[in-house]
């Protein structure tokens, strides 16, 4: 019996060394979410916005091969003043001929305009899901990439000024990714994945409709792998088309980009999106872990995704 146990132990060690794939820690990602939310609302021009920028920059400077800061100015629809924004780009394995982008926005919405309580409609939101969740996943990926270098070039891009737009005017949103796409600081990006609103406790991720048009091959590969890995949040159905940071990447930079997003937060009957209820209690480590697991698979198990 003792020899069987030793054999099984050695087999497990061999397999873990053979794969070289690190384990995504959902609790660490959730802690990243909590730390962002502790700064309060992070809408452009706020104290929280400045504080979380420093938080992200300080963290990735310790973890990435190099960090680029892309500064820009932008207007918020209906306001006379100009705002300063910063896209934060954490790069790994710059010499690889294959460069991919995984991105998320780090700002939060200035107004809870979808809140049923009208007295809240001009208040800024905490943005635990819509703002902190994608960043939380990226920061955990940054930690793993430091510990286990990838065979391809990974560019973790934290986009600013995504969520200060108004309904009916798409380009009043996504100011950071629009600027990035028109002024590319990185050459040769093969494809891109945007993570947005991925912390919902009731996470359900259909295929975003634009993504299917922009990069059908990547969509099929990711959702197929999610099924293989039994990551239940990824649903094999096509959802609505959403204007998100992947659209400027495709339209202005020609980067085949997709969006992983659960816009029905938390479900079709209740709405926390753009309300004062977008708080950490309505997010979970388990949801972040599901998305993070698939991103780890995408980064390290390249045989399923191409060179």
Per-range role (PLM):
Residues 122-217, 241, 245-246:
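Acidic/histidine-rich catalytic neighborhood of metal-dependent amide-processing enzymes
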Residues 71, 201-307:
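Active-site-adjacent substrate-binding region
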Residues 1-4:
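Positively charged n-region of N-terminal signal peptides that target proteins for export
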Residues 11-24:
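Bacterial Sec-dependent signal peptides at the C-terminal "C-region" and cleavage site
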Residues 89, 99-103, 127, 155-158, ...:
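Structural recognition of the beta-strand scaffold that forms the well-ordered cores
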Residues 31-95:
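A non-catalytic alpha/beta surface segment that caps or lines the substrate-entry region
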Residues 43-44, 73-75, 94-96, 106-110, ...:
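Solvent-exposed loop/turn segments at secondary-structure junctions
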Residues 20-23, 38-47, 75-79, 121-131, ...:
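Second-shell loop/turn segments in exported
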């Amino acid at each position: 019996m003792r020899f069987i146990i030793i054999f099984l132990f050695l087999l497990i060690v061999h397999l873990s060394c053979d794969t070289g794939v690190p384990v995504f820690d959902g609790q660490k990602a959730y802690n990243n979410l909590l730390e962002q939310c502790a700064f309060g609302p992070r809408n452009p021009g706020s104290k929280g916005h400045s504080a979380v920028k420093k938080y992200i920059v300080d963290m990735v400077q310790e973890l990435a091969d190099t960090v680029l800061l892309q500064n820009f100015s932008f207007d918020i629809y209906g306001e006379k003043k100009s705002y300063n924004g910063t896209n934060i780009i954490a790069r790994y394995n710059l010499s690889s001929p294959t460069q991919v982008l995984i991105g998320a926005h780090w700002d939060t919405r200035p107004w809870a305009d979808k809140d049923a309580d009208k007295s809240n409609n001009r208040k800024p939101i905490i943005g635990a899901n819509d703002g902190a969740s994608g960043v939380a996943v990226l920061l955990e990926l940054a930690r793993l990439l430091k510990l286990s270098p990838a065979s391809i070039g990974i560019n973790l891009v934290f986009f600013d000024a995504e969520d200060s737009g108004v309904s009916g005017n798409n380009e009043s949103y996504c100011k950071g990714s629009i600027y990035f796409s028109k002024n590319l600081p990185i050459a040769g990006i093969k494809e891109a994945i945007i993570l947005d609103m991925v912390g919902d406790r009731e996470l359900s991720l259909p295929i975003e409709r634009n993504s299917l048009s922009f990069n059908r091959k990547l969509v099929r590969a990711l959702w197929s792998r999610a099924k293989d890995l039994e990551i239940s949040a990824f649903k094999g159905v096509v959802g609505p088309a959403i204007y998100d940071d992947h659209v400027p990447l495709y339209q202005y930079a020609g980067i085949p980009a997709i969006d992983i997003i659960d816009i029905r937060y938390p479900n079709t009957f209740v709405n926390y999106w753009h309300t004062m209820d977008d708080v950490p209690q309505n997010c979970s480590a388990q949801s972040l872990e599901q998305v993070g697991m698939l991103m780890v698979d995408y980064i390290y198990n390249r045989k399923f995704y191409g060179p």
